[in-house]
Amino acid sequence: MDKTPRRLTLSVDGASRGNPGPAAIGVVIKDEKGATTLKVSSSIGRATNNQAEYTALITALREARKLGADHVDIRTDSQLMAEQILGHYKVRNANIKPLFEEVKQSLAGFKSYGMHHIPRERNSEADALANDALDTLNNS
């Protein structure tokens, strides 16, 4: 059996209309060759933008684990979330702390991870998935 370490790239985005308000997530998981392995576009109920961002990441990490990832490379346009996970910013919001702890616990299950803050225009695929879920919610 081939036990080559599996490295996946996780692009995540959360969106909220109202902040807090109706919220949704977008996740794109790609393999080592850049091929899309999984996409998630889902509403998550009422949440803030930051709660939605964290929920997107939790979902992506859970799916990456199911796909057998050993290493994950995370891309997000949320500077706050990226800096909190890297330990550069403190988590002060009581609603974010349990989500942050869940992310940290999940990350500990991987051999390694990278966290990258990227411009929104470079996260357009995950952003579109989150907004598509919100649009579907608003039109139903």
Task: Walk through the language-model features, giving the residues of each.
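N-terminal intrinsically disordered, compositionally biased regulatory/targeting segments
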Residues: 1-3, 97, 140
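RNase H-like nuclease fold core
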Residues: 2-51, 62-66, 70
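RNase H catalytic domain
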Residues: 15-19, 58-138
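Residues at secondary-structure transition points
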Residues: 43-51, 55, 91-94, 98
